Amino acid sequence: MPALLLLVLLASSAGQARARPSNATSAEPAGPLPALLAHLRRLTGALTGGGGAASPGANGTRTGPAGGAGAAARAPPPAELCHGYYDVMGQYDATFNCSTGSYRFCCGTCHYRFCCEHRHMRLAQASCSNYDTPRWATTPPPLAGGAGGAGGAGGGPGPGQAGWLEGGRTGGAGGRGGEGPGGSTAYVVCGVISFALAVGVGAKVAFSKASRAPRAHRDINVPRALVDILRHQAGPGTRPDRARSSSLTPGIGGPDSMPPRTPKNLYNTVKTPNLDWRALPPPSPSLHYSTLSCSRSFHNLSHLPPSYEAAVKSELNRYSSLKRLAEKDLDEAYLKRRPLELPRGTLPLHALRRPGTGGGYRMEAWGGPEELGLAPAPNPRRVMSQEHLLGDGGRSRYEFTLPRARLVSQEHLLLSSPEALRQSREHLLSPPRSPALPPDPTARASLAASHSNLLLGPGGPPTPLRGLPPPSSLHAHHHHALHGSPQPAWMSDAGGGGGTLARRPPFQRQGTLEQLQFIPGHHLPQHLRTASKNEVTV
């Protein structure tokens, strides 16, 4: 009731005030009633939660003093700052300011904060302890001087939080490091792997080169071992004989009658295609031995071409034995040399009978061993073939020759024994083709000349023996002797004494003289000095 009375009083006083003219001004001071009314309005506004200002007059020139106080009472509260903190995942949430609309208060929990509009839901941030990095987190402490601790536009850190709240957020989100050391580790690992690969490749290349060198030495040791065996079998005192026997056809009149053949390297299995033996100048006799010894020396194998190893591998079957090498060398020698003397180790195909002696024979018709060139060698050499060395002996497959002294004694035995002479003739000629003995000395000379031409080979013109006149039918005997014709010289001479054999049809020629050595079973008498203990006659 008292309040209603007061309101009535106030309304009446306000009506009286409005009844006054607006432009009138009172000079007298105001009474105590308006002051009392103003005090009452303030009290009622405080009790009701805010009172409105007095409504303006009609012309809007007056405003009640209570209007300013109501506007100040309705102003929004200041914005609150939520400080940065570490959440439950160990991640740092930066500081933010609650200044949007009516959301002026920092609410929530210590590990999850947000802005709200209710004052009673405010969070006491000073009571939280998650402003530092947790112990279980692996992130290093952030560097000082970061900008993460800067506050919002309208606020700052609370009282007592300037140091420990800003220090908790230094470096911002870049505080979680580790990228630098991880990148350098990757580079180091890649470098180590590359270095290991390079070392492995280099080691493999070096090992392959080291293993290839012993293999080449093993390949070349086989022919070198064979050369070493031949040099040891030849002996230290056989070099003069080797030098003499290397020239297959020395001249009869002397060493200057014919230039010696160019010495051939017997150990070189690869022929040089651009060299010809006819274009080479003949060496002097003084340099013959030195050239031969150097070409056949065991230590002069450095002249072999680079393809020596490949030639040894591809030609291993062809040059596997000394017998094949001897055949090849002897074929070339028969094609290139001139027939100047009888080969060693051969006997005439027909023996001579002294007329009227009844089987007795003499050496005077043939001449002495010195005239026939059958003088014994000072140091004969013999070389066993490779098949004989590596096999079971095999003596039945070869025909071994004898020294010259023993050949002369064997010739004496054949001339003194008719039975041995008959067996020798049966061995050299087929039984139905064995001719009769020559009747006179003229026929003996003709027969000896024909045998000389037979044994000398097809290299040049026929040359008679020393001390014997050349016969008239020398070419015919040479042809028949080479092609196996059994008709001797005295069978074509009707005036010869002692009787003749019945005539046989001449042998039909199957090939030329050069093709004879390539026909199977028609090889010429061949003999090779091979510097071994057992000479091989092919």
UniProtKB/Swiss-Prot annotation:
Q: Which residues lie on this side of the membrane: Extracellular?
A: 20-186
Phosphothreonine: modified positions: 512
Record keyword Glycoprotein present: yes
Membrane topology, as annotated = Single-pass type I membrane protein
Q: Where is the composition biased (Pro residues)?
A: 432-441, 459-472
Task: Name the residue ranges of motif: PDZ-binding.
Answer: 535-538
In which compartments does the protein localize? Postsynaptic density membrane
Q: Which GO terms describe its molecular function?
A: GABA receptor binding
Positions modified as Phosphoserine?
A: 417
Q: Which residues form the signal peptide?
A: 1-19
Q: Where is the composition biased (Gly residues)?
A: 145-178
Recorded GO CC terms: dendritic spine membrane; postsynaptic density; postsynaptic density membrane; postsynaptic membrane
Glycosylated residues, per the record, are 23, 59
InterPro entries attached to this UniProt entry: Shisa (IPR026910), Shisa_N (IPR053891)
Region span, Disordered = 49-73, 139-178, 233-262, 423-505
Q: Which residue pairs form cystines in this protein?
A: none
Task: Kindly list the residue ranges recorded as spanning the membrane.
Answer: 187-207
Chief location of this protein?
Answer: membrane
Which residues point to the Cytoplasmic side? 208-538
Question: From what superkingdom does this record's organism come?
Answer: Eukaryota
Which keywords annotate this record? Cell membrane, Glycoprotein, Membrane, Phosphoprotein, Postsynaptic cell membrane, Signal, Synapse, Transmembrane, Transmembrane helix
Q: What is known of its domains?
A: The PDZ-binding motif interacts with PDZ-domain of scaffolding protein DLG4.
Please give the function described in this protein's UniProt entry.
Answer: Transmembrane protein that regulates gamma-aminobutyric acid type A receptor (GABA(A)R) trafficking, channel deactivation kinetics and pharmacology, necessary for fast inhibitory transmission in the brain. Enhances the action of benzodiazepine, a primary GABA(A)Rs target drug, in the brain. May affect channel kinetics of AMPA-type glutamate receptors (AMPAR), the brain's main excitatory neurotransmitter, necessary for synaptic hippocampal plasticity, and memory recall. May regulate the induction and maintenance of long-term potentiation at Schaffer collaterals/CA3-CA1 excitatory synapses.
Q: What is this protein called?
A: Protein shisa-7
Source species of the chain: Homo sapiens (Human)
